[in-house]
């Protein structure tokens, strides 16, 4: 029942506010605010028909809100994070903003305005978009008076997928940096 509150989600686990999706590449494809679905899924979406810029698609078919566009997810999440920061302006109380970026994780789907900007293929373009997203949040912190009293932690959970090897061959782009290996390897990459 899409009208029922979501149990055991971020709000039930201590967050004051939540906006997002369950994950970018698994259904249901709809926005969730606090503990409610904003747009009830009314169609079945098969994103496997669309090809990512690089690698495998990694999207599961499933229920979606009308006119759901997976390509707009990163920018919409960024807009909402900036809006939330702006809503805190003038408040003299600490806050915690958790912003789990969907990029540059698969599916590799850089927005059109970032395509061709990196010289390192679709993944590089998605990294440029990720940098832009992080920059928007940092600019919002600065603009709203939080820049000098805020700790920003930017981290990653693993190294690149196996399709990093063609990226090395095609663009001489080593997304694992100086580390050895890739995701699921025994090495640190």
Where are these regions (language model features)?
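Short C-terminal domain-edge/linker segments immediately following a structured domain
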Residues: 25, 47-54, 127-133, 184-187
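A generic "alpha-helical surface" signal
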Residues: 72-79, 121-128, 132
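Histidine-centered active-site microenvironments of extracellular/periplasmic hydrolases
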Residues: 2-13, 107-110, 116-126, 139-189
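Beta-strand elements within well-structured catalytic alpha/beta cores of enzymes
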Residues: 81, 95-100, 127-130, 134, ...
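Formylglycine-dependent
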Residues: 1-93, 101-112
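Short linear sequence elements within intrinsically disordered, low-complexity coil regions
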Residues: 20-22, 119, 128
